[in-house]
């Protein structure tokens, strides 16, 4: 299964992430965001970051998850290439781990910096056992 794909969007980047579970789709979404910024296959898992979020709904939970990861890039230049997520739908909470390392210009390709997550065109759906997350990030 393809984990994610990009779609054209004026001045920003659209992402469609897939997963066999909601958690896997959230992990794919995070991977796609960091793939916009660098080649994630070059990221070593030297640092582990734990993230806990509470959302008002699934869209808000996705927004908070991606935005939290971007804060680590903005503040510490951390790039992530592996993620583990668990979601409690009853309490609308997310517990996640992100694995990666600090950006190194000699090792990591510098692509487009993602400035922020948005709600623009956000859609979370399920089709034939596949969860689909569609959203746009600001670049």
From Swiss-Prot:
Entry keyword set: Calcium, Metal-binding, tRNA processing
InterPro entries named in the record: Archease (IPR002804), Archease_arc (IPR022952), Archease_dom (IPR023572), Archease_dom_sf (IPR036820)
Binding site for Ca(2+): 12, 138-139
One example of a Gene Ontology biological process annotation: tRNA splicing, via endonucleolytic cleavage and ligation
One MF term in the entry's GO annotations: calcium ion binding
Function: Activates the tRNA-splicing ligase complex by facilitating the enzymatic turnover of catalytic subunit RtcB. Acts by promoting the guanylylation of RtcB, a key intermediate step in tRNA ligation. Can also alter the NTP specificity of RtcB such that ATP, dGTP or ITP is used efficiently.
HAMAP family named among the record's database cross-references: Archease_arch
Family: Belongs to the archease family.
Protein name: Protein archease
Organism whose genome encodes this protein: Sulfolobus acidocaldarius (strain ATCC 33909 / DSM 639 / JCM 8929 / NBRC 15157 / NCIMB 11770)
